Amino acid sequence: MGSHPYAYLHYGYNLGGGGTPWNISELPSDEDYPEWIPSWIDPFEAADIVREQCYYDLVEERLLAEVGGFRERRADHDKSGYYMRRHAALKRVGIELSGHGYMPDSEIGGYVLHIYETSVQPLDPAYAVDFASLEHRRVEEEWDGRLDQAMSALQITCTQPAGWLLVASYT
């Protein structure tokens, strides 16, 4: 594997993809190994858009617009306060897409759409997790509802329920 292993604890959806099959219901049914093409992008330009922007950027932009109410385009970055407004919107959304698995040449094992993340790294390999506190936060902060809102904005349904995911990455 890689020379820098990391373990991440997420609360969210395991979307699959990368080197594994997608765990998304909205996939083309006429392909042996279907790729997720987001329904909100032009299908004729989809392959180029996914290759140029990658799923991380596509998902972030969509969640910023649909969940965070931030519709300024990146081209507008010269406006005064753009990055402060963008950062505030990202914080409001509170959900992001992460990759996991072995990442040679940007190949990944899959994607997780998550609302919570903590990690264990080689310098601090033991990390105590207070699951009772996290479960309290999950309920109080309505993580499931917020994740469902994000999935609705992305116009996808995961074939697996949201939950706690322990994933490894190697860089």
Predicted regions and their residues:
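Acidic (Asp/Glu-rich) sequence patches and key acidic residues
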Residues: 1-152, 156-157, 170-171
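Core of folded catalytic or high-affinity ligand/protein-binding domains
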Residues: 162-170
